[in-house]
Amino acid sequence: YIKVYDADGNEKSSTEIEQPQGEDGMELSLGVNSIVLDKDENLVCNVNIWGWGATSDSYFDEYRIMVFDKNGNKTADNKIENYLDRMYADNEGVIHTTQYGENGQEMVTVDVATGTFGDGVTIGETYFSTCFFNEDNNMVAPSGTGLYEINMKTGEKTKYMNLIGCGVSPSSLQTVGILSNGTLAAFITYYSELDQKSISELVKFKEITKEEWGNKKTLLLACDYLDSSIEQLVLEANRKATDYVIDVVEYVSSGEEEDYYEARNQYYAALASNKDIDIVVFSYNGYSSLQNFAKKGLLTDLTPLMEANGSIKKSDIFDSIVNICSMNDKLVALPTGFGISTLVANPQVVGNGESWTVKEAMDLLNSMPEGTKFTQYATRDGMLEDLIDLNYRSFIDIEKGKCDLDNEEFKDVLRFSALFPKEYDYDDDSYADPYEELGAGRTICDTCYLSDYSVLQVYERIFGTPGNYIGYPTSEENGALINMDGAIGITTNADDPQACFDLIAPLYKLRTYEDGTNMYSLPIRKDSFKNMTEKWKTKESYDTWYLNETLGELEMQPPTQEQIDIIEKNINNAIGVQGALPTEIKNIIMEEASAFYSGDKTVDEVTPLIQSRVTIYLSETN
């Protein structure tokens, strides 16, 4: 129905939207994607009609623009040939929508009388869920950490407002606009990871004077990109805004046109030079940068700050996390969460050993029937990168600036990685179900990400017995890699490091997991992990996974003590870290190793070259 109400909420008219009828018994559904008022105060509706027929290939899907007058009478109904995104009305009542043109995303005009599109302005690659038009009739849309104004004549983009500073996430905006009294308002929905619940709010913004601002101080948080948990922390702090507010500089903003690696380099350069930065975030693959800045003395020891705060102690944290985040006996960062990347195999194939060397793994693969794969999807560069991330301590000492890459152990790493394909062909006609291949022993291992108990039950079904989480081949005691969700540190330039830690401390509070959410990332606290495990054991319902035609469906069960022990053992014993080596060192190794892979040089010829180049790199960067 289209219903018209007066200002007091009394219904003035009601018009039924006719339910579309499909041919040959096809059942159609109708959905209204957006509603706007045009310059004549007609109601313009963006409608999607879709449905399935009796056969799988009989599918109907079309977009229409329906127009209703003030009394609810339909005055136009036009089919749109292309996908129609959400519509917006500017201050003159002209209707706009987004389309992709030759130069990227465009905001184009919509002729509601004919259902055709007019001229548009290129607005870049930024995706936005809502927008409004300001007093200059320019579009204002969320992007990065705030709202940006886009000139509707030139497409030029300028910062309009910092939303994060007001305690509102741009991604939470459902609608935003200027009320009749000139107030900027928005309807927002978001999930609070700190409160562990979904929240919907109507918010209004007010410009305040310096006197109203008072003596509040600003702390600057720098990040390559802002993940949801850290964003929630910033928003909560800024909403309270008692003594401090947190300003955010995001260098790699999703949806922006800047080159990713160039933006990352700008970010790391800023960390080294910008003395205004108080809090720094290293993303999931930024561990080598964390080491680099700690080595330069740019990160504060968090231990005394934790002791003064009192909400978390170093002894609360898994030792493996403390170890990888400690440099020169200082705890310089804490991840917001983590997972464990490892290899799992059938113990009937690899035995019950808890680790294996590269040579042992290579010998096993060479002893298997022809066509046996080590893992289903691993590539040459991918396996090489994982092995050097895991074994880097055996070959490279970042802190001392020394390396030993011209030895038999490293040569085995190159020999082993050479057994993998350069790239995996996903279109290969010889594709086989990975679970079938693993269960039959035609694939030795599978890459496994341990962040909850479900995956352990999957492999137990595949093998018919608990899997052996043997890890990647290594000379170390354990072959598991820690994948940090993101790590937070405090710079030595911070004027008030204690205030910085007090603001980030809620990220590390004891979690109860009462609502059963966010149970797919491991917490760094041992007591939170215990609570997470207890919640897994007492869930009201468990997911059912479909594996394949042979294995069928698998209904998850409460974890057994053996499964709990597997996760804990991998957490406690893991010493490798994803992203441990700088990209520059990995590139040197891969560049020189390519001559060995192609057969142009022997392994004995390439390792001295790798040793020489990495030595030069370490001396220059130290």
What are these regions (language model features)?
Residues 285-342, 466-473:
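Hinge/lid segment of periplasmic solute-binding proteins
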Residues 300-316, 393-414, 471-480, 599:
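Short, solvent-exposed loop/beta-turn-alpha elements that line the ligand-binding surface or hinge
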Residues 542-614, 618:
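C-terminal capping/gating helix-and-loop segments adjacent to ligand/active sites or protein-protein/ligand interfaces
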Residues 399-432, 457-460, 467-472:
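Glycine-centered hinge/linker elements that transmit conformational signals in sensory
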Residues 69-72, 82-102, 112-114, 123-288, ...:
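Conserved N-terminal structural module of periplasmic/extracytoplasmic solute-binding proteins
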